[in-house]
Amino acid sequence: MRDADADAGGGADGGDGRGGHSCRGGVDTAAAPAGGAPPAHAPGPGRDAASAARGSRMRPHIFTLSVPFPTPLEAEIAHGSLAPDAEPHQRVVGKDLTVSGRILVVRWKAEDCRLLRISVINFLDQLSLVVRTMQRFGPPVSR
């Protein structure tokens, strides 16, 4: 399994390994102080408030999963079983399934790391069901 954000030290769970409510590279939510007002955010070094606001666009979170199968035929069967499942949040989470030899490759792209995490978890549940079903019925017969 390979996470593109892991190269920079973060992941889909919030980036800092704590599994908190913030997304690395995304919008962090901060708790309001006792007075009730949210904390003010100062622009970074050499930036004024206007350029900080323009530069606050989030980079998309990208997650790629490579699933090896014993044979290319089994990878194709899994692809055929999993590809028809539409993504519930199609506007904010993109999911692309491809097969390369005996490897099923799934690539997600999302603006919101929480929706990305939900999509990956749901996919892993479906993948688990497909793999267990394939194991129960035995190796496929060549077409």
From Swiss-Prot:
One of its GO terms (biological process) is tRNA processing. The keyword Cytoplasm applies. The keyword tRNA processing applies. It is found in: Cytoplasm; Nucleus. Belongs to the CTAG/PCC1 family. Component of the EKC/KEOPS complex that is required for the formation of a threonylcarbamoyl group on adenosine at position 37 (t(6)A37) in tRNAs that read codons beginning with adenine. The complex is probably involved in the transfer of the threonylcarbamoyl moiety of threonylcarbamoyl-AMP (TC-AMP) to the N6 group of A37. LAGE3 functions as a dimerization module for the complex. Keywords: Cytoplasm, Disease variant, Epilepsy, Intellectual disability, Nucleus, tRNA processing. Residues 1-57 are annotated as: Disordered. Its main location: cytoplasm. This is EKC/KEOPS complex subunit LAGE3. GO terms for cellular component: cytoplasm; EKC/KEOPS complex; nuclear body; nucleoplasm; nucleus. InterPro entries: CTAG/Pcc1. It is linked to Galloway-Mowat syndrome 2, X-linked: A form of Galloway-Mowat syndrome, a severe renal-neurological disease characterized by early-onset nephrotic syndrome associated with microcephaly, central nervous system abnormalities, developmental delays, and a propensity for seizures. Brain anomalies include gyration defects ranging from lissencephaly to pachygyria and polymicrogyria, and cerebellar hypoplasia. Most patients show facial dysmorphism characterized by a small, narrow forehead, large/floppy ears, deep-set eyes, hypertelorism and micrognathia. Ubiquitous. Residues 30-55 have a biased composition (Low complexity). Component of the EKC/KEOPS complex composed of at least GON7, TP53RK, TPRKB, OSGEP and LAGE3; the whole complex dimerizes.
